[in-house]
């Protein structure tokens, strides 16, 4: 039976995630209100503007029910702004910005600069594969990880060693990435995550 995956559809790149998920055989639901969380096997928090997503989640009374669902074990794939929304700490939070505080990391927003500084590359991601295509658009970076957080992806440093910025982590049922896997033709991130979701169903 195909898993039912919710995609938070308040703002940002949710349509691209839906397209990839459906191409891999998943059923999808756009999530805007707490009732949309019922019966989900997994949920995606897409990229976009983290401050806007935060305000809309609170305006639509989605933040607390979503927080509760994730704490109960609902599998999560968070990309770019979705990572920011989950973090316990932000180095450069906007005035009045809240997070769900579900992922024990510190994040610096827009760490790679403006939209003009966006770039594409490949990453080796533990549990996903080597040479995975990744698109970074005004991407955040993870500057601290808590003791229960596994680092699964880092950018290469100037010498080509994989010891640069942390751009992917896993903590229990949460997979969080700085980049946009949905903006590439490489579906391995979604495919791997869906396999894990299906195993939980």
UniProtKB/Swiss-Prot annotation:
EC number: 4.3.3.6, 3.5.1.2
KW Disulfide bond (keyword) present: no
Binding site for L-glutamine: 48-50, 109, 137-138
Family annotation (SUPFAM superfamilies): Class I glutamine amidotransferase-like
InterPro entries, alphabetized: Class_I_gatase-like, PdxT/SNO, PdxT/SNO_CS
Active site, renumbered: 80, 180, 182
Pfam families (alphabetical): SNO
Record keywords: Glutamine amidotransferase, Hydrolase, Lyase, Pyridoxal phosphate
GO annotations of cellular component type: cytosol; glutaminase complex
Catalytic activity: aldehydo-D-ribose 5-phosphate + D-glyceraldehyde 3-phosphate + L-glutamine = pyridoxal 5'-phosphate + L-glutamate + phosphate + 3 H2O + H(+); L-glutamine + H2O = L-glutamate + NH4(+)
Single GO BP term: pyridoxine metabolic process
HAMAP family in the cross-refs: PdxT
Role according to the record: Catalyzes the hydrolysis of glutamine to glutamate and ammonia as part of the biosynthesis of pyridoxal 5'-phosphate. The resulting ammonia molecule is channeled to the active site of PdxS.
Subunit structure as annotated in this protein's UniProt entry: In the presence of PdxS, forms a dodecamer of heterodimers. Only shows activity in the heterodimer.
Protein family per UniProt: Belongs to the glutaminase PdxT/SNO family.
Protein name: Pyridoxal 5'-phosphate synthase subunit PdxT
């Amino acid at each position: 039976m195909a898993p039912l995956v919710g995609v938070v559809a308040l703002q940002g790149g949710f349509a691209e995630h839906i397209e990839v998920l459906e191409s891999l055989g998943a059923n999808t639901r756009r999530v805007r209100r707490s009732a949309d969380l019922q019966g989900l096997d997994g949920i995606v928090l897409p990229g976009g503007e983290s401050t806007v997503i935060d305000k809309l989640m609170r305006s639509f009374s989605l933040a607390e029910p979503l927080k509760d669902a994730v704490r109960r074990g609902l599998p999560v794939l968070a990309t770019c702004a979705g990572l920011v929304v989950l973090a316990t700490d932000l180095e450069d939070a906007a005035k009045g910005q809240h997070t769900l505080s579900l992922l024990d990391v510190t994040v610096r927003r827009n760490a790679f600069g403006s939209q003009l500084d966006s770039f594409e590359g490949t990453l080796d991601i533990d549990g996903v594969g080597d040479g995975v295509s990744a698109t970074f658009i005004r991407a955040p970076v993870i500057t601290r990880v808590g003791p229960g957080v596994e680092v699964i992806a880092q950018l290469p440093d100037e010498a080509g060693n994989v010891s640069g910025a942390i751009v992917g982590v896993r903590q229990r049922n949460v997979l969080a990435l700085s980049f946009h896997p949905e903006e590439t033709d490489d579906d391995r991130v979604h495919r791997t995550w869906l396999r894990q979701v299906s195993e939980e169903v």
